[in-house]
């Protein structure tokens, strides 16, 4: 649930969205905001254990989001990004994941509540990005026992034709390497069957 397009009124809209969503579905929400005040307001009305999207090593974001999740039972997406930008290699992703996972665990976030997003980058920009992502998923699941992995899948096909076919095939490849969760279009029946 993201209300970031409502600049200046994000908190109000985020609360409204969560209230309305939870009237029709009986599952927790993934709340997406870099604003800790908006997150805290949304969490006050959220029913059940929410997921926060996301924390990263970007200095301002890490410092803002960590107090919201520290010592709680919230699920948290740990985005492999730092103040230096997006990592391109598996090694760079692992370094960031290591700092994020260890920092969260040291602040009493259960390891099973951490969902590392190694960041999918478009293969139309660099054809090695897909391999680097897949290797990162496998390495993260091996190195950090109990941690989950997830991603925003459609980034892989950005700028390319027939995106849905690329997305579906890449999803299967990523799941085979250990990916636990995908941010996808749930109305794509073929994707849901992949």
Task: Identify the meaning behind each predicted range.
Residues 1-27, 119-130:
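Glycine-rich, proline-tolerant flexible connector loops at the mouths of alpha/beta enzymes
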Residues 55-58, 81-82:
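Short, acidic/turn-prone active-site loops that include or flank metal/cofactor-
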Residues 59-65:
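Alpha-helical scaffolding within the catalytic cores
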Residues 33-37, 58:
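Short glycine-enriched loops at secondary-structure junctions
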Residues 5, 30, 51-53, 77-78, ...:
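Conserved beta-strand positions in the central sheet of alpha/beta enzyme cores
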Residues 24-30, 47-51, 144-158:
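Short beta-strand/loop segments at the ligand-binding rim of alpha/beta enzyme cores
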Residues 64, 71-194:
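Catalytic alpha/beta core domains of metabolic enzymes, predominantly
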């Amino acid at each position: 649930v993201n209300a970031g397009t409502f600049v200046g009124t994000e908190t109000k809209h985020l609360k409204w969205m969560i209230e309305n969503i939870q009237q029709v579905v009986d599952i927790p929400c993934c709340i997406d905001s870099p604003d800790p005040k908006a997150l805290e307001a949304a969490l006050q009305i959220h029913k059940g254990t929410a997921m926060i999207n996301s924390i990263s090593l970007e200095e301002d974001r890490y410092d803002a989001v960590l107090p919201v999740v520290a010592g709680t039972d919230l699920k948290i997406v740990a985005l492999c990004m730092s103040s230096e930008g997006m990592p391109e290699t598996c090694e760079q992703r692992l370094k960031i994941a290591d700092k994020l996972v260890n920092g969260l665990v040291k602040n009493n976030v259960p390891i099973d509540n951490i969902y590392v997003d190694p960041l999918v980058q478009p293969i139309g920009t660099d054809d090695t990005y897909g391999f680097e992502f897949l290797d990162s998923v496998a390495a993260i699941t091996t190195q950090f026992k109990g941690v989950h992995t997830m991603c925003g899948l459609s980034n892989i096909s950005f700028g390319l034709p027939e995106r849905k076919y690329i997305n579906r095939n890449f999803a299967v490849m990523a799941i085979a390497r250990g990916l636990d969760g995908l941010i996808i279009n749930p109305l794509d029946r073929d994707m849901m069957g992949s």
